[in-house]
């Protein structure tokens, strides 16, 4: 989220991740939205709270890669596929689909960022981690029946699969095998938007939400309505 501004010390972005099972959060202040910075933050998140099965994302350019080369699959997507994490992009222009993290972002603003004065960016980074620890241990959620995130993890005896503490960001000069999902709403023009590329879809899909799945191993784009495969497109990746 961001940018936000620290008086006398410039702007920053907050990299916020929430686990939908426990509502554990991971937050980290960053100076930029550059993809390598986000990838490094993701690595630290996965070392702390574990690797997810799915990573739900909005359609921010930093997450998907390049407008000029939409089939090159950017660093964040390659990193997810490398660790067998399935990225899922929400519909374009529908931020409420990320409701859980949007609710936390509101909490971050009201109970952290706007409640105190930060002397500097480094001070904010330290205080962000204090807020992360406090939230996970003490923030009670009605959807968790009044429990805190750490209560849920403890009671479930949950042991996440985490990256080793010394794991480095891998060199990702190829697109790993895996799947990338995009949820899209089809309007009357029958256009399916995949990272800026336009595909024409069958008329019967008008005014429906569909799931488009890029299967990188076979260079194919599969289109599903509910769980039924309704169309397939050749989708040759670049940068392999």
Model-inferred region functions:
Residues 136-240:
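C-terminal, beta-rich DNA-binding module of retroviral/retroelements integrases
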Residues 19-20, 224:
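Short, acidic, Ser/Thr-enriched surface-loop or helix-capping motifs
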Residues 1-14, 20-125, 129, 133-136, ...:
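RNase H-like DDE/DDD metal-dependent nuclease/strand-transfer catalytic core used by mobile genetic elements
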């Amino acid at each position: 989220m961001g940018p936000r501004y620290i008086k006398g010390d410039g702007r920053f972005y907050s990299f916020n991740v929430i686990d939908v099972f426990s509502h554990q959060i991971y937050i980290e202040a960053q100076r930029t939205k550059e993809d390598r910075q986000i990838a490094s933050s993701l690595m630290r998140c996965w070392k702390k709270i574990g690797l997810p099965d799915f990573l739900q994302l909005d359609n921010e350019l930093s997450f998907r890669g390049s407008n000029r080369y939409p089939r090159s699959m950017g660093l964040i997507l390659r990193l997810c596929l490398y660790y067998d994490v399935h990225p899922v992009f929400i519909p374009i222009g529908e931020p409420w689909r990320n409701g859980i993290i949007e609710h936390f972002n509101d909490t971050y603003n009201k109970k952290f960022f706007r409640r105190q004065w930060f002397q500097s960016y480094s001070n904010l980074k330290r205080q962000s981690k204090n807020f992360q620890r406090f939230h996970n241990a003490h923030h009670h959620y009605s959807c968790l029946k009044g429990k805190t995130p750490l209560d849920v993890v403890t009671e479930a005896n949950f042991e996440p699969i985490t990256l080793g503490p010394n794991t480095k960001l891998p060199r990702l000069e190829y697109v790993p095998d895996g799947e990338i999902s995009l949820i899209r709403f089809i309007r009357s023009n029958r256009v399916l938007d995949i990272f800026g590329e336009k595909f024409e879809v069958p008329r019967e899909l008008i005014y429906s939400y569909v799931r488009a799945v890029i299967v990188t191993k076979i260079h194919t784009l599969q289109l599903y309505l509910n769980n039924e495969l309704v169309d397939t497109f050749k989708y040759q990746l670049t940068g392999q």
